[in-house]
Regions:
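Beta1/beta-strand and adjacent pyrophosphate-binding region of the FAD-binding site
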Residues: 159
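…; additionally, a secondary subgroup of soluble metalloenzymes is captured
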Residues: 1-156, 165-315, 319-327
Length: 327
């Protein structure tokens, strides 16, 4: 039954028949229903592919707007979902043992995302951002510490996940929201331009002055920020009771070790690198969407663990920059 149903749904999408219904249910409703049923679970990837292909077809045509403020608003309210549909389409497409039956749908989906959405969006954003002198009206990443960290009344753990773009952050936000013990909020911030790791990481530290040296090193108030120890020195110059840690170092620590490190600290920066580590290399860039899913899982698990083991309840999750990616 599921194989026949999947073939029918795929045919409807290949014909771009978004109004197709079965027993009064739309394509996304059918996919969600079948995934929950016993025999449909073994076809979860196929149903997720179909559901997200539908999302790209239904919402993928980019609507030009006037001005960067409206472009930002439209992305937050609608366009980020297109990026998310694209991410999940390939996340599950890559899990298929045999993708031959879905190649035609993949080509159609890719064409819509690339030509009807991404290309038009980039032209519009570049034009609007240039006209606005590089100002979006969003809070600036340059003001992150003074705006978000310095004013905190309790110990704050800042988790900086390299290349955690907005729509992936929304996925994490929704996961946190679903936890009845958690109160989460989500907001956007304008990254520094150009949006490279070295600039974004420096901007997230407390500073009065950020400079790019002739050798392309970035300094904060005259101090280097290339590695963990250098960033910790910058942070401790402003907040003595603070630490900078790597996610990979603390994920395997015992409870006693965590408590020893976190006791007495007011601010702890945790650097997490799952997405950029794989997406920024040609040999692993096709794994970037799997890395996004793993990043959400890892950050969620870290928050749960530190809440119990390190007596911490206030977290800020942010990124140095985002990313654009297409197959």
């Amino acid at each position: 039954v599921d194989r026949r149903l999947i073939a029918w749904l795929r045919g409807r999408l290949e014909s771009e028949d978004l109004d197709a219904r079965l027993d009064g249910k739309s394509i996304p409703e059918i996919c969600a229903l079948r995934r929950r049923l016993h025999f449909g679970r073994q076809f979860r990837s196929e149903y997720f592919i179909l559901e997200n292909a539908f999302g790209i077809m239904a919402h993928g045509s980019y609507t030009p707007v006037s001005g960067i403020a409206d472009a930002v608003r439209q992305y937050i309210e609608r366009d980020e979902a297109v990026d998310r549909h694209y991410r999940y389409f390939y996340l599950y497409f890559d899990r298929l043992e045999n993708s031959a039956d879905f190649e035609r749908l993949r080509d159609l989906t890719e064409n819509i995302y690339t030509n009807d959405h991404l290309n038009k969006q980039l032209v519009g954003w570049n034009r609007s951002l240039t006209e606005a002198g590089g100002k979006t009206g969003l809070p600036r990443q340059l003001d992150f510490y003074s705006r978000c960290v310095r004013t905190a009344r309790e110990r704050t753990v800042v988790i900086i996940s390299d290349a955690l773009r907005y729509e992936v952050g929304r996925t994490l936000f929704e996961r946190l929201q679903a936890d009845e013990k958690c109160t989460a909020t989500l907001s956007a911030m304008q990254a520094v331009l150009p949006s490279y790791t070295r600039f974004g990481m420096a901007a997230l530290l407390p500073h009065k002055r950020i400079e790019l040296c002739p050798d392309l090193r970035v300094t904060v108030d005259g101090k280097p920020t290339d590695d963990l120890k250098q960033r910790e020195a910058v942070l401790q110059a402003v907040q003595p009771n603070s630490r900078c840690l790597r996610f990979d170092d603390i994920r395997s620590m015992k409870v006693a070790e965590l408590r020893e490190i976190f006791t007495g600290q007011d601010v702890v920066y945790v650097y997490h690198n799952q997405i950029d580590a794989r997406g920024d290399k040609a040999s692993t860039e096709n794994e970037v969407f799997a890395a996004c899913e793993e990043a959400v899982d890892e950050i969620f698990a870290l928050i749960k663990r530190l809440t119990v083991s390190a007596n911490t309840i206030h977290y800020i999750i942010t990124a140095d920059h985002g990313f654009l990616y297409k197959r």
